[in-house]
Amino acid sequence: MSVEQSLLGKETQYPTSYQPDVLFPIARAQSREKYAHIEGITQGKDWWHVFEISWLNAHGIPQVAIGRITLPASSPNLIESKSLKLYFNSLNFTQFDSTQSFIETVEKDLSAAAGAKVELTLFQVDDLEISKPQGICIDDLMPERLEQHPDATLLKLDESGEEIEVELYSHLLRSNCPVTGQPDWGTVFIRFKGKKPCYRSLLAYIISYRQHNGFHEQCVEQIFADIWQNLQPEKLMVYATYTRRGGLDINPCRVSDLTWMPKPIRLARQ
């Protein structure tokens, strides 16, 4: 299905009965065509936090939880966010014999839409803790050049030629939803092993996404691909934690080496 057929940006009725068919898959293949040769584009996970989950237990009593969805980056489809919100709303008045039954139903439906195994972990509403970012924040540096659209020529190696392993992060990631034009805000983590990158050039590159139209997953994959091609690290991880919209936040992570997969976190802006 094409994104133009999705419910994004359209007025919709919120379902009050279980409707798995509201889930809208979007094929990853088209946005990945130019990166097909790059190692790591399909390695990683998309983590979603769902803050508006509710269903009825066997006695008809409402239950609430926070959910973490784990979607493999190798899945043929991602799931459009508004359709996911509508899907979870459709479960609000549905009875389940147990919490496990609820989890299994959601995993079955999301796996069918994604075309791969999707996992759901539930947290009590007070249990999903806020983490502090680890690594070196590059936000106070002064870039040499600023652009308003992604420009891979901004990426440079440090003149020292030093070999390093480092984790950097920036809170300045901003892009736009390609359908609604609404701004998406995020923190991006970059773990890098190889010749030292110029940190100022990395910040300039991240800032260059401010007027870019792209889904969260596509932005992370483009960042990964541009760094991989232009800076040629031995190993690379790119992980973005986006702020919440409509009760959901999306957190894509791509890695060149699966041993570099981080644990999912929730930051203060989420």
From Swiss-Prot:
> Where, per UniProt, does this protein localize?
Cytoplasm
Question: Can you tell me which residues bind NADPH?
Answer: S81, K82, R245, G246
Keywords of the record: Cytoplasm, NADP, Oxidoreductase, Queuosine biosynthesis
What domain of life is recorded for the organism?
Bacteria
Gene Ontology annotations of biological process type: queuosine biosynthetic process; tRNA modification
What does the record give as the reaction this protein catalyses?
7-aminomethyl-7-carbaguanine + 2 NADP(+) = 7-cyano-7-deazaguanine + 2 NADPH + 3 H(+)
Example GO molecular function term?
Answer: preQ1 synthase activity
Record keywords: Ribosomal protein included? no
Instruction: Quote the pathway field.
Output: tRNA modification; tRNA-queuosine biosynthesis
Q: Which residues form the active site?
A: C177, D184
| Residue positions binding substrate | I79, E80, S81, H216, E217
Q: Which InterPro entries match?
A: GTP-CH-I_C/QueF, NADPH_dep_7-cyano-7-deazaG_red, QueF, QueF_N, QueF_type2
Q: Which GO terms describe its cellular component?
A: cytoplasm
- Identify the EC number(s): 1.7.1.13
Briefly, what is this protein's role?
Catalyzes the NADPH-dependent reduction of 7-cyano-7-deazaguanine (preQ0) to 7-aminomethyl-7-deazaguanine (preQ1).
Q: Summarize the subunit comment.
A: Homodimer.
The UniProt family comment states:
Belongs to the GTP cyclohydrolase I family. QueF type 2 subfamily.
Under what name is this protein listed?
NADPH-dependent 7-cyano-7-deazaguanine reductase
Record organism? Acinetobacter baumannii (strain ACICU)
The upper taxonomy is: Bacteria, Pseudomonadati, Pseudomonadota, Gammaproteobacteria, Moraxellales
**Primary gene name:** queF
